[in-house]
């Protein structure tokens, strides 16, 4: 089993989380159902929190 460099894993995951924030928010902005749009906005907020945590960890590792 190959080991994965922590910084590489964090950078890859950060990119994924940032894409999810954009995707969820784009869907929320386009939906005509306010309840579902709000749900997608919450998803975007949660992913943004994850992205911030990952960025902080990356800064600690540098």
Regions picked out by a protein language model, each given a short descriptive name:
Residues 1-62:
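Iron-associated oxidoreductase/ferritin-like identity signal
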């Amino acid at each position: 089993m190959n080991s994965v460099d922590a910084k590489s894993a964090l950078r890859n995951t950060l990119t994924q989380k940032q894409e999810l924030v954009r995707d969820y928010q784009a869907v929320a902005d386009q939906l005509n159902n306010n309840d579902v749009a709000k749900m997608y906005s919450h998803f975007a907020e949660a992913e943004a929190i994850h992205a911030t945590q990952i960025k902080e960890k990356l800064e600690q590792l540098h």
